[in-house]
């Protein structure tokens, strides 16, 4: 059963301007160490790095919407991180307030599954998150 859906669309250039203005202060506040490492590995061009951050920013916004909280009520940017499963499929890893909210919205006898789609086509980045509950026996 679907517990929450969220989407976000962001202008990559806007993220680039925030990074130029605030640098590491912004990156440290919003992105996990794993997300920053992923962006560093894409350092072939500045455009790729900024697009990588923009997609992850959109994913966090979409996830916060799917959680039903937005970035408030104890859910913070670094509580949500984009990670890839062994087969490469992206998903969200939640900690802190985001994990607590996910646990609270998941019915007993079920486990939460977070499906994430992220994409970019300059100058836009988009993310779509679906949070579902799957039977613990099937998980």
From Swiss-Prot:
GO cellular component terms, A-Z: cytoplasm
Biological source species: Rhodopseudomonas palustris (strain BisB18)
Catalysed conversion reaction: apo-[ACP] + CoA = holo-[ACP] + adenosine 3',5'-bisphosphate + H(+)
Protein name according to UniProt: Holo-[acyl-carrier-protein] synthase
Family membership: Belongs to the P-Pant transferase superfamily. AcpS family.
Iron recorded as keyword: no
Enzyme Commission code: 2.7.8.7
The protein's role, per its UniProt record: Transfers the 4'-phosphopantetheine moiety from coenzyme A to a Ser of acyl-carrier-protein.
Subcellular location: Cytoplasm
Lineage: Bacteria, Pseudomonadati, Pseudomonadota, Alphaproteobacteria, Hyphomicrobiales
Essential cofactor(s): Mg(2+)
Principal localisation: cytoplasm
GO BP terms: fatty acid biosynthetic process
Keyword list, A-Z: Cytoplasm, Fatty acid biosynthesis, Fatty acid metabolism, Lipid biosynthesis, Lipid metabolism, Magnesium, Metal-binding, Transferase
Residues annotated for Mg(2+) binding in this entry: 8, 61
Domain of life: Bacteria
Entry GO MF terms: holo-[acyl-carrier-protein] synthase activity; magnesium ion binding
